[in-house]
Amino acid sequence: MKLIKDIRIYRSQTENIAGSSMPQQFSNYALHITAHRIAMKLRENGFSLGDFDHLYINLTTCPVADRLAPSKRGSDPFHKWYREYEAEISQPFYDTLETPQCIRPVTEILEQILLKFFCIPQYDPELIHACISDALTQGAQMLVKYKEKQASGRKAILYLRYLDNGRYFPLLRVYDADDTLLLETDLPETNHLDAYGTIRLSAKKVTIQPKKSAYAQTPEPLTFFIP
């Protein structure tokens, strides 16, 4: 079982089958941001799609069985990490897909797909709805727990916020054994999370070790002293 990583929204006005052109991506950047926030919140809550971790949703004016269904194109044997699902929509709705007004109804379609195909007792409707609601109402202020470390009577939590510009804005908080906040600091905005690998924690300081990369220069660790 893989934790969800991303949700991507596409559109098409031709049947999405093998041999046809692939569905189009949106230039509606706000919609992409919202979909990724939803995926982040679902992942924080342990949500899994099964044996894949990217969910692609194609909004189409073509007929779809029961209006929501797995794509007729089928799974890609060379890219098993994603699956496509389709939602039938009207032409007037299709014409709004590059406007801000489409975001809420598109997220309602996303919720319907999650409920229909991925809702199990562990991921009940309330959890799915709460994650989507948090992403919509909190936006760039939504905190998603990314990493946590407990040691020496301290607890360090690294949160992520996903900004409207498509960058992550991490937040570090350190608590004592009574959950009293000892340290809170914003970390630099970033496009990638390579700088945030493991957390080392003692009574006096917290250090965030970067992920090791074979393809890029490893950034320096980030160290903060606890008051």
Regions from the language model: what does each represent?
Residues 1-112, 193-227:
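Acidic, small-residue rich beta-repeat scaffolds with periodic aromatic anchors
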Residues 140-148, 189-200:
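Repeated scaffold domains used in trafficking and secretory/extracellular systems
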Residues 148-154:
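Short coil-to-beta-strand transition motifs
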Residues 154-158, 207:
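Structural core positions within WD40/WD-like beta-propeller blades
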Residues 162-165, 213-215:
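Short glycine/acidic-enriched loop and turn motifs that connect beta-strands
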Residues 167-170, 194-195:
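Short, surface-exposed coil-to-beta transition loops
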